[in-house]
């Protein structure tokens, strides 16, 4: 098919990602289609990465559990990758019904190449030749997030937050002018607004600070996706689906000082096999591949103790002893703490009121 007569190949390329809550049902998919068409009509080439419809991935996992107590990871990938394929096809249909040419691609069809770790693969290369060809024809390209193909031609999935990583990887490979991550929150806040009433929406934030918050439990972006954005240097905007607000720009220098706190009650504490100088109560695991700090995103199954954590992000926290002592005072008695280049993490036992600690840390530290 030839490009539309009014198509300009020099139009800016925009990569958008929509999460499952934004695509929860047919009505939500129709609303996203309206948003995509409006953006095309403003003079942009669009690549849209989609997650599975809200709740469908968990439903597929439960379905697998009804069939097998220990399903093979390869077969889980074959099953779980279908969720995003449903969404991509439905959204492509909805856009086409509005008079805009669209085509859907799986992760493998759009050139997402991964390693061979089933259910938790990592992207090693992106070859978006077909995506570029369809953009040149004036079509909107819909991509199934969360999945790719290994170098041995096996279907793989990227683990939780994989659709975010798909969008950022495609934006980098395409040299996109803009990348936008849409979810059900307005952007990045200085704390979880559900437990901190005066949490502030941040206009901008740096890569490292966002990654620290994500590893501490902030849900605006998965930590692996935040790490990918930092390594690739891909600036993006975190926005709420359907909102007119501009959200948070991620990738600029960010704000000075201490900018935010986050918390999690789903971390695993792995007892250190040996002490590390300068790190107290550090989450550490030693293996043949080396020493890993921060167990939240370790790959594979490792033994650990469930614990709660609180994270404060900002460079001033680590260079100003007063700020450090304030943080430790407001979260005491913590069981242990450890530092990263952009923030400080504290660990607590299972009986700790993590929401109250989050409010206290926010009131004490966030400027």
At which residue positions do the language-model features occur?
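Short phosphate-binding/catalytic loops that engage adenosine nucleotides
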Residues: 44, 100, 234, 332-333
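A generic structural signal for short, non-catalytic loop/turn and secondary-structure boundary residues
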Residues: 9, 135-136, 243, 303-305
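Short linear loop/turn motifs
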Residues: 109-113, 242-246, 285-286, 291
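Hydrophobic alpha-helix position signal
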Residues: 95, 213, 229, 277-279, ...
